[in-house]
Amino acid sequence: MAIGKRLNKAREGVDREKLYPLAEAIKMVKERAKAKFDETIEVAINLGVDPRHADQMVRGVVTLPNGTGRTLRVGVFARGAKADEAKAAGADVVGAEDLVEKVQNGSIDFDRCIATPDMMPLVGRLGKVLGPRGLMPNPKIGTVTMDVTGAVKGAKGGSVEFRVEKAGILQAGVGKASFSEEKLVENIKALADAVSKAKPAGSKGTYIQRVAVSSTMGPGVKVEPGTILG
């Protein structure tokens, strides 16, 4: 079946104007996840912020209680004992100057990037390469740290970085279609709680304005914003 026809069929029974309680929305999304692979369940949250202003940026990291269902490759910039610690914690790629050179040459073989503070003068040169991919280590989200073990295990264990993009939209993968409805609800509520705690001082009016959930190949289902909290 062509993708367009499949999506149209999946939209059947979804009222595009209605706001559904979170649990009901998740049930509908799961029922419509019919691809031949385990689709990712994604949430999109429209926030009452303008990320063009520094005092309205929303960014953070949260460990989802039920993981993401995705196996991440973790890269660590570290030397000596910290490099050994990263390897022992399960990092997939570890290095210093050698890893910087690989990245500069276009070899980026990781989905999450961590660095010890002493490596940042070197890693800073990679801003134009790592930045656009959302991979630049940042102390605010715990990816510039001396706790290499904690950062690697967190990334491997289901931590999700979130960041508001243009137009005030924040998007994140919160699990797989194979997850139970209960686990997906728990993950979304954990993300919503972290996003709420990250509310910037510059945000005025309603903070969480609109919410929708979807699967990789399925239609979006609008959610009552109040049902993703608590």
UniProtKB/Swiss-Prot annotation:
InterPro entries: Ribosom_uL1_bac-type, Ribosomal_uL1, Ribosomal_uL1-like, Ribosomal_uL1/biogenesis, Ribosomal_uL1_3-a/b-sand, Ribosomal_uL1_CS
Record GO terms (molecular function): rRNA binding; structural constituent of ribosome; tRNA binding
SUPFAM superfamilies according to UniProt: Ribosomal protein L1
Any single biological process term in GO: translation
Listed Pfam families: Ribosomal_L1 (PF00687)
Keyword set, alphabetical order: Repressor, Ribonucleoprotein, Ribosomal protein, RNA-binding, rRNA-binding, Translation regulation, tRNA-binding
GO cellular component: cytosolic large ribosomal subunit
The protein's assembly and partners: Part of the 50S ribosomal subunit.
HAMAP family reported for this sequence: Ribosomal_uL1_B
Name of the protein described by the UniProt record: Large ribosomal subunit protein uL1
